[in-house]
Structure formats: structure tokens, C-alpha cells
Amino acid sequence: MIQLVYNKQKGIFMDLEFIFNHVISGYLPIMVLLILYFIILKSFGNRPSKGHIILTFIFSFYLVGVLSATGVCLKANFSPRFSLLPFIDMIRGPKDAVLNVILFLPLGIFLPLLYEQYNSLSKVFLLGFLFSLSIEIIQMFGFGTTDINDLITNTFGAVLGYGVYELLRRLFSDSLLEKFQTKGKYSLYEPVILWTITILIMLTIQLYIYDILFASKMSGEIQKW
């Protein structure tokens, strides 16, 4: 579930800034690791296209954003909350369902666009499901509510994103899209490794970077509220 706290008096989502600050805190170490990763690939004679490299940096920024928006950027406090009844909350609160679909829609576009191995609806479905499941498991540790409806809507968002990708394939030539794509067996594992490393960074290093860069500023803003 996307973590948003609304201030009725000011009529704004203050924590959009809060989320963005966590995105920046998490993206800085990810960016350094990606630079090292592509340097190592080049040293071994494996040179991805410039389009793939640039889009991978954008994709990693998106992944950090997903984790920040779902609360996987805060200090752990084990207090599990569960919502295991499917579809009921979707009917009661369709806004959350729509936001969850939108949140994972880019994933269904990025995966086949970046990795040849994910030019498959079944693989996008599986990875969308696993990515969402990992978030729901982590949310057991005080980062939000573990909700089966989030799992359903996130996975549907990834599948819908794959449909958008197929539409793009019809609009643009394959040669243009292939400029962003990497091939080979390792392309099957790269997004999984990137997602895992991003989670680990968001739960560890990111917290310290956030405290250094933004904690004092945000605590002052909270006191004003």
C-alpha cells in the first residue's frame, strides 16, 4: 500500500517530500554500485548499449521510488498487520487499488524493454508477483499493512504494463527498442539482483544517508504541523 499522510488543514501531501528525500537517499548508493557494475562488465568485454545503461539508471530510480512509496525506507518495528480478504478493500477503497496498479505499471514496461529474457507475459507476471510479494513480506515489520489486495493490484499493474510495451512494439521498430535491451542468460537474473540489492540498501545504508541529509530538516517541518 502506498504510504501517504494527508494534512487536512494545509490541504497538501507533505510526505511527498518525505518520500522523495528517501528516494534520493537510497538512489545515491545504488547509482555508485551501478557505475561500478557497468565498469566491471566493460572490463570483461561485455559492453551494454548506451541506451541500456541510461535506462537501467532510470529503472533503478523507479525501483527505489516504489520501495519508498510503500514505506520500505523506514526503521523496522515488528508490528504485523494483515488484510487477507481479496477484493473487499478494492471495492471499499478503489483509489488505493488504482494507485497500486499505476505503481507497478512501469515495471511491466521496463522489464521487456531492458531484458530480452522478459519479453514474455508469463515472466513479467511472475516477477511482478514476486516483487510485490517481497514488499508485502517486508511490510510485516512495521512498514505498513500486508494486504493481499496490494499483491493482486500490483501484479495486474505489471501485466498491464507489459500490454503497454506490446503496444510500443507496434508503434516503433524493433531495432529502436533493441537499443535498450540486453541479451543473454544473465539478463534473466539482473533485475532480480538489482531489486534485491535495492531492498537491502533501502533497509540499511539509505537510513544513515537520510539521517545525514534530511532528518533535521524534516523533524523541523513535522514540528510545524
Region roles according to the model:
Residues 6-137, 141-142, 166-225:
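Bulky hydrophobic segments
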